[in-house]
Amino acid sequence: MRRLLMKGIRFYQRAFSAFSPAHCRYYPTCSNYTLEAINRFGAVKGVLMGVARILRCQPLVKGGFDPVPAHFSLRRNPQYKEEDHRGKKR
């Protein structure tokens, strides 16, 4: 199941995402975040984390650097909450 999900996300990245300008508010992108979460936590938890991340990616949120946390969580990685994608404090 894990491989099938990861292949589906990679297909999306090559077929659709590659032809549109990058507009994700977060780094890494939501699709890359989901790939890493699935790889690290398995299919079910990884998909849940990916869906939670996509739901956070909306106009009322600043975005920034938000890597997959070391432990399963549906919230933004608190270690990087006030930092931008270069790791500098805002």
UniProtKB/Swiss-Prot annotation:
Gene Ontology cellular component terms for the protein in this record: plasma membrane
Keywords: Cell membrane, Membrane
Keyword Membrane annotated: yes
PANTHER family (alphabetical): MEMBRANE PROTEIN INSERTION EFFICIENCY FACTOR-RELATED
Disordered, as annotated region: 68-90
Subcellular locations according to the entry: Cell membrane
Similarity comment text for this entry: Belongs to the UPF0161 family.
Protein name: Putative membrane protein insertion efficiency factor
Entry-linked InterPro entries: Membr_insert_effic_factor_YidD (IPR002696)
Database matches in Pfam families: YidD
